[in-house]
Amino acid sequence: MKPVHPTIRLPVTLAAAALLVLALGPAQDAGAGGSAHGARAPIMKTRKIAPGLKYIRIVRRQIPLRAFVLKVDLSKAITLDTTIADDALPSRRQLSRIVRNHGALAGVNGDPGEGLGNTVHPFAQDGDLLHTAGPDAEMFAVSKDESSTFLGNPKLKVNVTDLSSGRVFTMDRWNRRAPEPGEIVGFSPLGGTLASPPSFSCSVRLLPQGAPQVAAPDGVDRDYAVDVATCSESPLDRNGGVVISTAPGTDEAEMLLALTPGTLMRLHWTLGWPGVFDAVGGDPILLLDGVPAPICVSCARQPRTAVGVTATGQILLVVIDGRRPGWSRGATLGELRAILRDLGAVDALNLDGGGSSEMVVDGEVVNRPSDGRERRITNAVLILPGADPGE
C-alpha cells in the first residue's frame, strides 16, 4: 500500500517500449519481457484522442497477439473516473453504454463482478463507498484532484461520529448484509435492492447535509442529520439518505435509539490513502515499486485487462484479446506483467478478464471481446473530458 507519484508528468518513449511489448514468443518464459531473436517488430498505431489521452493499438501477427492501450496523463484537462454500471446495485450494462451515458472519451472494464450484479472487491465512485468486502483487497485508486494515484492493499475503515457527543460508531460492514448481534452495519442509496436495510432491526436514518469532502489526513467525510431512530419488523427506507442498523435488544441498539432527530453525524470512510474519491479492485497485483509480485505461474493465457502506473505517474489501461485463434491468443499473468513493464509500468494490477475484457474509444468497441459480443459488466474505469461532474 503506497502513494504512487504526483501527476506532473514526463513523456514516456512509448514507441521504443512497444518494440518489446509483444515480442513474447511461444517458447519464452511467462514472466519474461524483451524481444525474441529474429522476430519482426510489432505493428503499432497511435491516435491522440484528447490532450493527455492517447490510444495505442499493437499487433503481433506471428504469435498472434493484439493489445490495446490507453495512455493517460492526468495533469491535462481529463479525469479518471470509476463507476458502477447503473445508479445502484444490482448493476449490469455493456461498456459501450456506460461510456455513452457518462459522456466519456474512453473506458475499460473494471473489477470482476459477482453474479448478482455487484463488484467482488470494495469500490468507490465520486466519494461514495459502494461496499466493504474482505480484508485482503487489492485496489487502484485516484485522488479527487487527480494529482495522485495509489495501488496496493488498502486499510478500509468506515465509521459514523455523533458530532455533539463525539461518540464513534464503527461500521462492521457497508452495503453487504444484515447485522449479527453486536454489529452495526450501514446501507446507502448505492446499495439499491441488492443491499437494502434489514427487517427486524433497530435502525437510524441519516439525511445528507452536504456533498462528500476530502478528509484529513485521509479518507472522505460527509455530514448527515438524524431523521428517525426506531426498531421495526419492516426495513427502514433510506429516502435518499443512509440507514445504520443493528440487532434489537443489544447495547448497540440502545446507543442508536438514543440519537435524537436533528443530531449532526459525520460519515467517514477511508482506504488509508489521502484524498481518494475513486477506487477499483482487482487481483492480483502484478508490480509494486517495480518489483514483480507473486502471481499464478500456471494460469493459462486469457483475455486480460489491467491498470498500470509508470515511474513518471502516467496511467496505462491495457486490454489484451484472447481465446481467438488467428487473431489473439491472450496472455498469461506473467506475459501481462511483462507487457506492462515494457510499457513503462512500475505498479500494475490485473482487473477483470475473460469475456469481460473490453475497451471503448470514441464510442467504438476497439477490441474483439472473446464472447463475440459485449458482455454486461458491473463497473468500469472511464476517462472523462474535463472535470468529473459527479464530484
Located regions from the model:
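Bacterial N-terminal signal peptides that target proteins for export
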Residues: 2-14
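Gly/Ser/Thr/Pro-rich low-complexity, intrinsically disordered segments
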Residues: 9, 22, 28-391
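Bacterial N-terminal signal peptides
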Residues: 13-23
